[in-house]
Amino acid sequence: MVYYVKIGIGSQYGLAKYLFDFVYDRQIRNLRGSGKMLVFSLNRMSLPADQVLHKLEERGIRINHYAEKYISHPRFSAGQPGEITAAVVSLEELGLENGASLEELFRHIQGTPFRPCPPDTGFFLRLAWTDQPQSGNSILTGTHRSPDQAVTIRSEILVQDDAFPKGLYLRKVDGELWLRGYVCDPAYHFPGETLFAFETHRT
């Protein structure tokens, strides 16, 4: 089963949820049919970095310095405006029970309906997804693990430098919504329970 959510900014789209039967695409050979995924339809607009940061502040969404650095990159909002579909699914549901690095994950989704999201997907998803489940682990210093209930946006790498953020992730802590950037080296192994968002299409 899949939860499908139609989302946009402002009054363009109301927030509605639909539960419908989903037949997994045969191309996703390793995806276990017993699971669930969230599918979001997002209306993307081309916004400069200062407007993105202002909108986040206006909505009371917290960010870290890695997120600000990522958002300020010239390629962050360089894509064409329009509607995209993003799916949130765990590595386990993709058949990666033991987890994967970003490169292993990229290779694993080749030939499936999943592909990396445009860099600004996390921004639009964060504005819309206000009822994200709460994270249980609010303090993560020194853990080097993905936060509980966090969703990592699998987007293209903007800069081939391990000191530059690889992307964004969404979490909700103590009732506050966050959009955070993260850094990791190529060898970092995301656990199997990690939730990722990909661009996809409905089958």
Cite the ranges covered by each PLM segment.
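A binding-site-centric feature that preferentially detects glycan-recognition modules on secreted/surface proteins
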Residues: M1-T203
